Curated annotation (Swiss-Prot):
One of its GO terms (biological process) is fumagillin biosynthetic process. The chain crosses the membrane at residues 4-24. It catalyses: (+)-exo-beta-bergamotene + 2 reduced [NADPH--hemoprotein reductase] + 3 O2 = 5-dehydro-6-demethoxyfumagillol + 2 oxidized [NADPH--hemoprotein reductase] + 3 H2O + 2 H(+). Glycans are attached at residues 210, 293. It comes from Aspergillus fumigatus (strain ATCC MYA-4609 / CBS 101355 / FGSC A1100 / Af293). This is Multifunctional cytochrome P450 monooxygenase af510.
Length: 536
């Protein structure tokens, strides 16, 4: 979603001018109290034109502010202050140490109309959020709990390896299948359709695409000019309401259909243990008819935290593994050293597993380096201050949007020398650089609840890929290697721009291993036909 001043916004300025001036004057009084520096605002609209332009990733746009205005800078849009942190210590002081006062989310009118306020990552910091996060934490929030899902992750990784063996040119689609299969099986005990498009995957991915657009601060007219929400539907430019109603229906279907699937499977005692079935069993209210009944509050929490797991896990898993592949292609010496370690520790007669990780420090470093080199959330998700805060010499006004540049914290050459080099050994002796996961998974009480689960999915996929495949640059028709660079593309989830690469088995011995593993696989029956048809 681009930041653009639309015709609607311009036409509404006159309608809301008086209110806007009042709000602007009230809120910008704080500007005299030494808020962080930034570009000079225009009357009424403030720094609207200083928001990221269409087609540019946010973190690259805000990075320019670091050199122009310092490590903590700000802009003001229609009376709302945005504070951008390129100072890790300052960000930690505000969003870590003062998490109780800075864990709120911006009140985005458009996202709320779409129903995204039900997703865990977009909840306000309140009792509902704490209940939902506690529910997730109790099921997958620790290393021990996430270890219980390893058999599923390992099996799906093997399927990914075999799909790549048979159709290497479709590896990115195989990655999407892998991520969806893991999350849906763990969350709902649902087996996806592998011979075509799965209806549940399609539905939830549609919801995630909408989320990415809806949750960009001040990108929608009703967020930058809130007064227009009081205008009638017939007023020019109110089409955003039709979009919001459509997206809300998609969100509700994405939450309801798989939840209903689990309940029906449990009623027939045909369910697979999953996040949803485990919680239903824990919160079930006994009844004479043996139906699966839970309180309305528990049902809402189970239903929406479940779909939130997909929102947080699937897209980010694909993005980070794609970044690993980019790093391997750009720095071929990493592939060589990783394969030497795998061959020495594991051998070449089986695939690596989770038990091998502690003996594969270089491969473990590849996973750490991926989270650092191209973080999935380079600006995190926006926090909001709930009261005036002091940050060093600056005042952060109540209601400010807080944007930490996680990308810079993880690419600061003072912390990570040669930051644009993909260098897994930086976490080993004698370098011992800081573990990037402490930053990459977010701040304070908004940190990713499924971080151990996500990291495990990435590890098992990458280590098994490297064990049997060479990953290298593609060649053109003249046999010359095609150069690869890491290019950013805009979006809430950071992923590499498309690039060409080649994946092929390492040797005939590895081909034989893959064929043996393939012969041992038991076909899986899809649950797609058991879903109730969606009306969306």
């Amino acid at each position: 979603m681009a930041y653009e001043l639309s015709t609607l916004q311009l036409s509404c300025v006159a309608f809301v001018a008086f209110m806007a001036v009042l709000v602007f004057r009230t809120r910008t009084r704080n500007l005299k109290q030494n808020v962080p520096p930034g570009p000079r605002p225009l009357p009424i609209i403030g720094n609207f034109f200083d928001l990221p332009p269409k087609g540019q990733p946010e973190y690259l746009h805000w990075f320019k502010h670091k050199d122009a205005y310092g490590p903590v800078s700000s802009i003001n849009v229609m009376g709302t202050t945005l504070v951008i942190f390129h100072d890790k210590d300052a960000a930690h002081a505000v969003m870590g140490k003062k998490a109780q006062k800075t864990s709120a989310r911006p009140q985005l009118n458009f996202a709320q109309l779409c129903g995204f306020e039900n997703f865990l990552i977009t909840h306000q910091y309140n009792d509902k959020y704490r209940l939902h996060r506690k529910m997730v934490h109790q099921e997958i929030g620790t290393k021990g709990l996430s270890a219980g899902f390893r058999p599923i992750q390992e099996q799906e990784s093997i399927r990914f390896i075999l799909q790549t063996f048979n159709r290497p040119d479709d590896i990115l689609q195989h990655l999407k299948t892998l991520a969806a299969a893991i999350v849906l099986k763990i969350t709902y005990g649902y087996s996806i359709e592998r011979k075509g498009q799965d209806p549940l995957v399609e539905l939830i991915e549609h919801a995630m695409e909408n989320l990415s657009q809806a949750f960009v601060p001040l990108a929608w007219a009703v967020d930058s000019v809130p007064a227009i929400k009081y205008l009638p539907d017939w007023f020019p430019g109110m089409s955003y309401r039709k979009t919001a109603r459509k997206w809300r229906a998609i969100n509700e279907a994405a939450a309801e259909l798989p939840y209903d699937f689990v309940k029906r499977q449990m009623a027939h005692k045909a369910h697979q243990p999953s996040y949803v079935s485990n919680l239903l069993e824990k919160h079930m209210i006994k009844s004479e008819d043996n139906k699966i009944n839970v309180s309305a509050a528990d049902e809402e929490a189970i239903k929406w935290t479940a779909v939130s797991l997909y929102a947080a896990g699937s897209d980010s898993t694909v993005a980070i593994i794609h970044s690993v592949i980019c790093g391997l292609v750009m720095f071929p010496e990493v592939v060589t050293r990783a394969q030497e370690e795998i061959d020495r520790v594991v051998g070449s007669d089986r695939l690596p597993n989770f038990d091998d990780r502690t003996n594969l420090p270089y491969v473990d470093g590849i996973i750490k380096e991926a989270w650092r080199w191209n973080p999935v959330g380079p600006m995190g998700l926006t926090h909001k201050s709930e009261e005036d805060l002091v940050c060093g010499e600056y005042l952060i006004p109540k209601g400010s949007y807080l944007l930490p540049s996680l990308w810079w914290f993880l690419n600061d050459p003072k912390e990570y020398p040669e930051p644009r080099v993909f260098k897994p050994e930086r976490y080993m002796e004698p370098f011992n650089h800081p573990d990037p996961s402490e930053i990459a998974f977010g701040y304070g009480r908004r940190s990713c609840a499924g971080r151990y689960f996500a990291d495990a999915s990435v590890y098992i996929t990458v280590v098994q890929l490297l064990a049997v495949f060479n990953v290298r640059k593609a060649r053109d028709d003249q046999g010359n290697e095609i150069p690869v660079t890491l290019q950013a593309i805009p979006g809430m989830v950071n992923r590499p721009a498309p690039f060409q690469f080649k994946v092929e088995p390492r040797s005939q011995h590895h081909i034989d291993l893959l064929r043996r593993i393939e012969s041992e696989q038991i076909p899986e029956v899809s649950h797609a036909s058991l879903l109730k048809p969606s009306t969306v």
